[in-house]
A protein has these predicted regions:
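Catalytic Zn2+-binding segment of zinc metalloproteases
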Residues: 146-160
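Extended, hydrophobic/aromatic-rich amphipathic alpha-helical segments that build helical scaffolds
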Residues: 139-147
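Bacterial Sec-dependent N-terminal signal peptides
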Residues: 1-26
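Alpha-helical and His/Cys-centered functional microenvironments
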Residues: 9, 28, 149, 153
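N-terminal, motif-rich segments that launch catalysis or mediate targeting to/interaction with membranes
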Residues: 17-140, 156-293
């Protein structure tokens, strides 16, 4: 097994990246380390570009119509119980369109189908030997996959507005990783139990398994935040935290610490799973393309 070290350049990217971007970049960087040779060597040679562009899909949301719905799916709006969701929800986009209609799908998010489409674009890029498109599609695929590993990307209560928990999305996805990422075990190696990439014969099943696991975690994401907010009171739940040259009102460092403890490693586990899934889908796309040199 190879020993993993995050380069200084990548570390600086993580430290100085925009609000909400550091987790995506970290996942892409770690996913590269999980690849087997010869794919590892190719991705490593383009490591800085892939990590830098891990957030391109987010940047497009503000200027490209049709991009925003690729990052989520509000499963709760379809009225399925969790068990029924696993058994009966249409996993193929054509089936879902026929049942619910195009407008409903777009309004509720097309996250898993966006992953599938981007996966096949990556396969095509590998087959054609188009290096620029390989890098672009790999970066986008990693971003969409990572988003589906965030529980709040699978619910219409995306930012806690429906339950009076505004700001919970950035708390879970950004504030906790920024504060505690140094304690996370995120890359495979000699001293890690984390798996390297493997080939997924059925990429669609892999995508939906990750999505369902995220959706199952929503209750705990919301419950522990609500419990701590009630316990700590408004004055200690929030604080003005310095970010760059500004101060932003967000959950206090003490609240974030206790929330981190209550979740018992949940954010770390979802990041670990995202890294494994991203690297495995990159690898699977290369295999499906015929393992081009």
């Amino acid at each position: 097994p190879r020993v993993i070290q995050i380069s200084l350049g990548v570390f600086l990217l993580l430290v100085f990246s925009s609000w909400g971007f550091s987790s995506h970049r970290c996942i892409h960087d770690a996913a590269i380390q999980a690849l087997p040779d010869p794919l590892y060597s190719f991705f490593k040679s383009h490591r800085d570009w892939i990590v830098l562009h891990a957030v391109d899909a987010d940047l497009r949301k503000h200027r490209l119509i049709g991009e925003a719905e690729k990052h989520f799916i509000d499963l709760d709006l379809y009225g399925f119980s969790l068990d029924s969701l696993k058994r009966y929800f249409p996993r193929k986009q054509e089936d879902a369109k026929r049942i619910f209609g195009d407008s409903t799908l777009n309004a509720n998010g097309i996250g898993p189908w966006s992953v599938k489409q981007t996966y096949y674009r990556l396969v095509a890029s590998f087959s054609e030997g188009d290096e620029a498109q390989i890098l672009r599609n790999a970066s986008d695929l990693g971003h969409y996959v990572s988003d589906l590993h965030v529980p709040l990307h699978t619910t219409s209560n995306y930012n806690g507005v429906r339950t009076g928990q505004q700001g919970i999305h950035s708390l879970w996805e950004t504030q906790l990783p920024e504060l505690f990422i140094e304690s996370y075990n995120l890359t495979p190696g000699i001293h890690s139990h984390l798996p390297f990439a493997r080939y997924f014969k059925n990429s669609e099943n892999c995508i939906w398994e990750a999505l369902i696991a995220s959706h199952q975690a929503i209750d705990s994401v919301l419950y522990f935040e609500a419990m701590l907010s009630q316990e700590m009171g408004r004055t200690t739940t929030y604080a003005y935290v310095e970010r760059g040259r500004t101060q932003q009102r967000m959950r206090s460092p003490e609240f974030a610490k206790r929330y981190h403890q209550a979740l018992n490693g949940q954010v770390e586990r979802r990041m670990q799973k995202a890294i494994y899934t991203v690297s495995s889908l990159w690898y699977s796309a290369w295999i499906d393309a015929g393992q081009p040199e």
